[in-house]
């Protein structure tokens, strides 16, 4: 299997909403750092479906799809994967390519700004190849419309010329598989979403699954870790394998500086406390969000923009990076009137609902 990344995917995406400051990636960010993209993640990715830990139901469905496609000597049906970042959407795509013995071309929707960007990728596909488009909900209208006949009829319709002299030329494409990844499945248009034969959601991982992932990664990195140490890291990883692997590397740093030889529960706990990752996997920004809501808005309900303005954090970052996990563990509730801090969050912060905090 060859992995090819679109050259355009390295072009910085335009994001007018981002501002410098606290919304820079943190230790618990589910999005990969540049270094992780280039080296670490590639090294520790599994290459077979049976080696992929977690997502049991999804694995069963994909195994059936692959077996059926191989029996028919056909390509896989188009697949849409959705869920929070860091759960393995790219890894699954690479595994499918490896298992099917085809190439996987990787790109992201923000890189496909012009029709020629997607056209160049499509016409270079070989039979059975997989085209993986990350953040597919961000495709522009022209690019999306080019994909409709490509997905449905394996045909690329190109307009040549302008005005009255314009004509449409159709180019035959080999049968291929489009895998789209998104954190916002509701943002996809119905015509695009309806062209996927399989639509599957990735869920957050359980602690026992993350423990196995940490143990596997530690073995690949030649790092000694006890099961208790792996569990301590897993417990603070926000249900996300990418974060678990990142925390393992930081705990390994701490162990080496302390001249340790093995990551046990005590050492892992000490290291993660230094990195301000608490027992529930919250970092200082999570706590800032909760404390701001309690201190300034009496626990809510409060709107997202008000939280962003009060914390100095970007609203999109709060919504996409921090809020999903706080909702998952029940620390936040979303109501028609806004976000509300739950009683469980008060308890975790050592407060009663009547108490208030001073912002640190």
UniProtKB/Swiss-Prot annotation:
Function text: The RuvA-RuvB-RuvC complex processes Holliday junction (HJ) DNA during genetic recombination and DNA repair, while the RuvA-RuvB complex plays an important role in the rescue of blocked DNA replication forks via replication fork reversal (RFR). RuvA specifically binds to HJ cruciform DNA, conferring on it an open structure. The RuvB hexamer acts as an ATP-dependent pump, pulling dsDNA into and through the RuvAB complex. RuvB forms 2 homohexamers on either side of HJ DNA bound by 1 or 2 RuvA tetramers; 4 subunits per hexamer contact DNA at a time.
Annotated region described as Head domain (RuvB-H), given as residue ranges: 279-360
Comp. bias regions, Basic and acidic residues: 34-46
EC number: 3.6.4.-
Native source organism of the sequence: Rippkaea orientalis (strain PCC 8801 / RF-1) (Cyanothece sp. (strain PCC 8801))
Family in the record: Belongs to the RuvB family.
Upper classification of the organism: Bacteria, Bacillati, Cyanobacteriota, Cyanophyceae, Oscillatoriophycideae
Subunit architecture: Homohexamer. Forms an RuvA(8)-RuvB(12)-Holliday junction (HJ) complex. HJ DNA is sandwiched between 2 RuvA tetramers; dsDNA enters through RuvA and exits via RuvB. An RuvB hexamer assembles on each DNA strand where it exits the tetramer. Each RuvB hexamer is contacted by two RuvA subunits (via domain III) on 2 adjacent RuvB subunits; this complex drives branch migration. In the full resolvosome a probable DNA-RuvA(4)-RuvB(12)-RuvC(2) complex forms which resolves the HJ.
Record PANTHER family: HOLLIDAY JUNCTION BRANCH MIGRATION COMPLEX SUBUNIT RUVB, PTHR42848
Binding of DNA, residues: 334, 339
Keywords on record: ATP-binding, Cytoplasm, DNA damage, DNA recombination, DNA repair, DNA-binding, Hydrolase, Nucleotide-binding
HAMAP family tied to this protein: DNA_HJ_migration_RuvB
Protein name as catalogued: Holliday junction branch migration complex subunit RuvB
Chain positions covered by the region annotation Large ATPase domain (RuvB-L): 13-205
Reactions catalysed, as given in the entry: ATP + H2O = ADP + phosphate + H(+)
EC supergroup of this enzyme: hydrolase
GO biological process: DNA recombination; DNA repair
Domain remark in the UniProt entry: Has 3 domains, the large (RuvB-L) and small ATPase (RuvB-S) domains and the C-terminal head (RuvB-H) domain. The head domain binds DNA, while the ATPase domains jointly bind ATP, ADP or are empty depending on the state of the subunit in the translocation cycle. During a single DNA translocation step the structure of each domain remains the same, but their relative positions change.
Binding of ATP, residues: 44-45, 86, 89-91, 152-154, 195, 205, 242
Gene Ontology CC entries for this record: cytoplasm; Holliday junction resolvase complex
Positions annotated to bind Mg(2+): 90
SMART domains per the UniProt record, alphabetical: AAA
Alphabetized Pfam families for the sequence: AAA_lid_4, RuvB_C, RuvB_N
